[in-house]
Structures are given as C-alpha cells and as structure tokens.
Amino acid sequence: AVKRYWRYLVARYGAYPVVWCMCGEGIMPYYLSETREADAAQQKSGWTEVMAYVRSIDPYANLISIHPNLKGRQQVEDPSLMDFEMLQAAHRDIGSVARSIEQVTEAVGAEPVMPVIEAEVNFEGILGRSWQNVQRLNFYHAVMRGTAGHNYGANGIWQMSTVEEPYGRSPHGRSWGEIPWQEAAQLPGSRQVGLGGQFIRRFPWWELEPRPDWIRCEPDWTWDWPADVVIYGPVCVGIPRQLRIVYMPMVWTPGTIVAIEPDVSYTAYWFDPCTGKDIDIGPVEVSDAGEWTPPLPGECHDWLLVLTSTETAS
C-alpha cells in the first residue's frame, strides 16, 4: 500500500521541482507501543525498501530524504539512498542546543558525504520555552557548522491549533501547548531566524570553512557551567584572505581575532541578529602579533562579527 501511494505521488508530482520526504519520525514507534524495539526495526527495514523503490521509479531523480526521530542516517539501512540528511535534536530548550551542535558536527563529517539540514529542533514556545534567544542559538550554531539549510518551527503551527479547536493532548496524555497558530505565526523567533537566513545569503556560504583558530575568547561570568563553552563559545568560519564571520552567542567580552594575514586589509562590522541591523566598525587595526579585538557593540546579547577584505569589498 505504501509503495502504491508513493507511485501515485511520483506520477502526480514528480515533474515539478519537489523534494521527497519519505515520512515523518522515521523509526519512532507509536507513543503507546509495547514492542518499541521490534517496531523500530520493522520501520527501518520498510522505509529502506520504500526509499529504494521511489529512487528506482522517479524519472526526474528528485532529491530524497527522511524526517528522523534523531538522525536521518539511522532511519534506513542504506544511507546512500538519501540525497541529504535531516536531523532532529528534539525540544529540550538549551539542552537541545547542545544536542544539535553534537549532531550537526557528526553528520557534516559522516560518510557518505551529503548536505545536512537541522530539520526539527526546539519549536518556539513548545512546553512553554524555546523562545527567540534559543531559536537564534540553534540557527547560527547549525549553519556556522556546515548545514545546508535550517527549518524553523513554532508550537501551535505544527498542530494547526486554533482557539475554537485546540489540538489538545497527544496519545501519551499530555499537551505540548495550546497557542493558536495565528499567534504562533507572529512569534519573534520566526522573524529573527528569517533575518539570519538573509544574513547568511550575503556570502558564498558554501565556501565557508570552519576556522576555530581565528578566534580567541576566554570564558567570563556569563558562562555558568563547563558545558556553556559549547553553547556560548564563539564559532568562526571564513574564506582565507577574503572573509571572516564570528558568531558570538554572548558578547560580554568580545574575544580577539587572531592569525590575521599581514598583507590583507580588512574592514569590519557587527550584525545584530535580533534586528537585522549592521553597525559599522571600520578598518581593522591589526597589532604586530596579527591580532585585533573589536569594540563592544551597544547591547549585550549574541552578535555576529564580519571582517571583509577591502579588496573583496571593493
């Protein structure tokens, strides 16, 4: 029955520029199942067969993936059947930021190499948390570590909950939250993640390299626990001699840009991920040691620092 359904979908929509997602929550058993391990194994085998079938019958070779309960590669027996990997880091607020960082790092470096998308993490407002600050952390930590895209979600939208007909309780007996979709669509994280997408597309993002060796930042009082070094530590990417981008999840102390090429002149600016505004800094004045510490922006929260070579900028 599932193959027949997919055969219909391919025949009906295959000529359009579509992407095939085999299913949602690939190998996650039903909430109340008493045979969870056996169910997951059967689902993994079944979706592998269906994915191979769709690939064999689609004459347009549309991209194929699967929405996972954790990692896309774990949902099928042969990950090479997928064109890109979806991830899900769950909805544990700050805890899922750390999980997403771990998942993205592993997936981007895995074989076979394929594009990676953080497909579901921390729907805004779910369980009364995961608000806009967490949305920004999830987005920038993912794209700065090599993902090819990012999905934003909001509680209330995924259920299409309304005032007249709230979604209510899931089969496990609990409600994820009852904000109606009309309100959820206006949550600030949506706009701020959208601003992040506009920001990343300013640059040839597919050419960016991870460069942790270009930034030095010491922990300060805003880092409460040892694990905060992962969540609140800076992430740097760039293109040698052309571009440096640093995401600083908490700018109390701005950190120092290091290993600046002595024969390259840079100009710099701050990007505010809350408002989308640029704050010009001007020419980068490099020390004899090849280092530069930027001036603080006006308000302490997360910021992005951009250094562009004057030759590239012109």
Predicted regions, residues:
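Short, solvent-exposed loop/turn segments in extracellular or other extracytoplasmic domains
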Residues: 286-291
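Charge-dense, low-complexity intrinsically disordered segments
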Residues: 37, 41, 129, 183
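Catalytic-core region of carbohydrate-active enzymes that cleave or remodel glycosidic bonds
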Residues: 59-61, 79-170
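Active-site neighborhood of glycoside hydrolase catalytic domains
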Residues: 1-116
